[in-house]
């Protein structure tokens, strides 16, 4: 029987699939299900009730609450939703319950089809310590575990890892023996929070290693495909940021691909694997590699493999779960190159601080597909949120900070990288901060373009790509002027005397000052820019402004001339002459004061500020406020403690990651306003440090 005939014969096996997940992966699975004529069921938390994935499913079942533990990690609630909606199969996506063997057994025991590997295979790989023993016995190269009591200075750095972990959570690099205990404790806390299992182990940390992984697809009849490799060496906090297929390293080292595929197939056979999975390795530049783990699920980065093979990996998951054989002895050959960038709601310049709030606009050019392909050169966009005029997307604090995956495919690596860089640079990403600038800087970096990368790329060797924005100071000033011109046009259009220009005088020039903060939010003066719009009544030169560094900017035209309505989402086009060169900028104004300015100079997000600062917004010296909403997981000081600049005061967990709050000055802790377990919002007072320098200044003032 051919594969097509098998599919026709087995179609009744799966008729309605529930996806026990959220966001872009739920939308990805729904796409394949719809292509196959299957009915779809979503489950959603209260926070997700208006998300696209919940609207797109044929049926959606509420999981009361917001926290993962009461919603997407609540196995009983998910199974009850499947029963109520009449689902006969469950796809777990990735994360949440996808690698929970107990949940897989419960699905099967309920008479439903589990679209994933067997519970036994998940169990075998669920503990990284036990998995390493199995892999070593199967002949797969491994790194040995280290005993805490035996670790010496000469063995550093070492890596603390969660045995049940993944996604970078529960991982800590230790570089000094003094840090070993505290970093191990932090890894245990993260592991318990993310996976419900605080077991950790320690192994040697390879500083300049490269993360290489092999995509597996196996059926229940002994067939195993090593579909292709991916390189995921660009990471922050041990989480992948940019992935690509194939790997530049594997392409360069003779015979490495064959050895990788042989090891991956051996791993699959050792545990009787079926379905989609990934064998991850740590490699050096010589092509030597060591086993890291088997992810017993679909990976976030699976689109780059789909783009380079033409396969629908989710469709193959359905087929394997329905009992089909793999359609051929070997997978398709690799074709071209694909690169994926993960767009996160976070601030790389401030220790990857997660951002919550509103995404006002999220538009990309050159998108040829979403959740499939691409099968032609172009951009694939797999996004969780969607925006529309007057309907921003809201990013909360309960779930992962990833907004979307942007994937490019082209015949060559150079073309794929260039295409992705251009798409990200031109994208209209307005609202809360993202890592878009960092992604473009990485893709444009000479070493990245040459394939000279490793897992320390962001944290050690190329830190500047995370700290330097795409738009320089002059570009920010030019963009702010364009925003001010549109603001002036809006003001003119709403006055009764609209045909008399704002600030017009019979003699001399009229000057209007507009104030902006760079970024989304109220910000502060240090991150602000003031723009003077000068109109002359004595010439036809129109509005003009002279910026710093003696650059001259003159308005040529603004369309529409009477401004834009903030609520409609319609942009204004501003043509400026910058040092004699014409530039076209697109300006979107939003309710609440947000302004997105996009041009070939670079993207700039601004927030309108009042002409004069509100004294109530000024934070007292020595006061530390929460930079993000989250939960206080530990407090390391007490009132009266002497602290030094940079000393850890407490940690906050937000979006599944821990973030350290450190002292900003030397001094004495005079107040602690937060305790372990407190739920806090952005701007909440956490602590106050009395600085000797501040006291001296006060005394001098009093005298």
Question: Which residues does each PLM region occupy?
Answer:
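Conserved nucleotide-binding/hydrolysis modules and their immediate coupling elements
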Residues: 538-542, 548-583
